[in-house]
Design a protein with these regions (language model features):
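Transmembrane-embedded, aromatic-rich helix segments that form part
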Residues: 50-60, 188-191
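Specific aromatic-rich, kink-prone transmembrane helix
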Residues: 1, 57-58, 63-64
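Membrane-interfacial, low-structure loops and terminal tails that flank and connect transmembrane helices
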Residues: 2-35, 70-71, 160-169, 204-211, ...
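Membrane-interface alpha helices of multi-pass inner-membrane proteins
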Residues: 33-46, 173-179
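Transmembrane helical bundles and short interhelical boundary loops of multi-pass, membrane-embedded
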Residues: 76, 80-357, 426-427
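Residue-level signature of the transmembrane alpha-helical core
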Residues: 34, 38, 55-59, 286
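Extracytoplasmic
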Residues: 284, 291-472
Length: 472
């Protein structure tokens, strides 16, 4: 009697389920680009510096998606850029970028070119200040090591061949020697892994979309870290400082999202000695970086010499209690839309633990001019705005140094001033390192204010706050 063939374990295929699955895939092809485009447009408004890396990330995810034809990729790319442009257009219509070099720095024929001129004014080339091998490891160590382990594990899984310990040790040794000897260690630390990652992406192009997306995000992060070793966005400082820390923030986030699932997926299929070794390497890198935070806190607090806490104005309460009480009074007793006139200061400057522009900073009340350097930095792309800043700077200088019956009433009425704050800085000046307000005339200013109908509404120590007298 013939043996009975067992029933298949696979359940019969439900056509409705197939239709729903196909519909889900179809919706996913359109929803991802549309949502990515909307977020990209919002990013252009909120953090323009992050747009290049976000665009590269979205593009790599599209290119890495399985079973996507060139035509489909182009269509999806257009679906990303179209809503991005639509969302950002109202903002861009009135936006004057603060980055980029003035056109006068380029030869006239280059500055007039529509695309090349803009690119040359916007992107600078790093000729020095490249990160050392140690700096790269200190900054990116744990995420880099975890990403490399995930890459090796994925490489091993995709090639279905064990990774020979001798080959792996030789590769690590070569990378260490080359990184220490190279003038641009990032080419070794991130360039070589990027080449391996590109190969894995090509080999894994039929893998699950989620895994391909994680690989694409990791590739985007490493590409960005490598790119800032050669290029930077030109700004008022003329170096890559702002570009580096803004790109690093985004690259850390991308790696933190991409590395864990890649690592877990690869290690789940790694049955040899390598799995234990990989876990040990990742664990060691995390433990090696763990002391950074407590050691930094210990250093910056001078061994917890005194209680600091989370109160950002505690130092002001201790060093200048009269200023602190006056600021507290303004914050509690004035309308949120009040305009307080104080001496304009220089960026990051202090006089005896008293920061410049401390009143507007600590109260949230508007003033007519903030830190001089930052005011210029934010508006350097507009000649009209720079002229406005220069006018305000000159008026403030005359207001506090040469107060007269013409200048003082004009400034108060033009800018809708609600209160005039005359404190320590308005009496003694802003210090030798700030060229603004060297010889204030606080007593003469008080006399003029009272002559035009203003009176002290608050007095404490070195602080006097003036406001217009309300006549009944």
């Amino acid at each position: 009697q013939a043996a009975r063939v067992p029933e298949p374990l696979t359940p019969p295929i439900d056509k409705s389920t197939c239709h729903r699955s196909q519909a889900h895939v179809g919706r996913e092809r359109w929803t991802f680009p549309l949502l990515a485009g909307i977020f990209l447009g919002c990013l252009w408004i909120t953090n323009t510096w992050g747009v290049p890396l976000a665009t590269v990330t979205a593009g790599l995810i599209l290119l890495a998606r399985p079973r996507s034809s060139i035509r489909m990729t182009v269509v999806q790319g257009a679906l990303i850029l179209s809503p991005a442009a639509f969302v950002a257009l109202p903002f861009q219509a009135n936006y004057v970028p603060a980055y980029g070099a003035p056109a006068e720095e380029l030869p006239a024929f280059l500055a007039r070119l529509p695309v090349a001129g803009w690119f040359l004014r916007t992107v600078g080339i790093v000729v020095s200040e490249r990160s050392s091998f140690g700096e790269l490891l200190r900054t990116h160590g744990p995420l880099l090591v975890s990403g490399l382990v995930a890459l090796v594990a994925t490489f091993r899984a995709s090639d279905h061949q064990p990774v020979r310990p001798a080959v792996l040790a030789s590769a690590v040794g070569f990378a260490l020697v080359a990184g220490l000897a190279s003038a641009t260690p990032a080419l070794v630390v991130f360039g070589l892994p990027l080449a391996g990652l590109a190969w894995v992406l090509w080999r894994e192009r039929t893998a699950a979309p989620e895994r391909l997306a994680a690989l694409a995000m990791l590739a985007a992060a490493w590409s960005a870290i490598l790119a800032v070793e050669f290029f930077y966005l030109r700004d008022v400082f003329g170096d890559r400082m702002n570009t580096v820390f803004k790109v690093y923030f985004d690259a850390w986030v991308l790696q933190a999202i991409a590395v864990p699932p890649l690592l877990l997926h690869a290690l789940a299929n790694w049955k040899s000695w390598g799995k234990s070794m990989a876990i040990a390497v990742v664990g060691f890198s995390l433990l090696a970086a763990a002391p950074y935070t407590p050691l930094s806190v210990w250093k910056w607090t001078d061994g917890f010499a005194q209680l600091i806490g989370l109160d950002g104005l505690a130092y002001l309460r201790q060093a200048h209690p009269d200023e602190f009480r006056a600021i507290t009074w303004l914050r509690e007793s004035t309308r949120p839309d009040a305009v307080v006139l104080e001496a304009s200061g220089c960026s990051y400057s202090m006089v005896g633990a008293l920061p410049h522009n401390r009143v507007s900073m600590a109260t949230g009340r508007a003033t007519i001019l903030g830190w001089e350097g930052h005011e210029y930095q934010w508006r350097r792309g507009s000649a009209r705005d720079l002229a406005t800043l220069q006018k305000r700077r000159e008026l403030l200088l005359r207001f506090f140094q040469e107060p007269g019956m013409e200048t003082v009433p004009s400034v108060l009425s033009t800018y809708g001033i609600s209160y005039v704050f005359v404190g320590t800085l308005e009496r003694t000046g802003l210090g030798p390192n700030c060229p603004f307000l060297r010889s204030p005339a606080a007593e003469a200013l008080g006399t003029v204010l009272q002559q035009i109908g203003w009176a002290p509404v608050y007095q404490d120590g070195a602080v006097t706050i003036y406001a217009p007298v309300v006549r009944r």
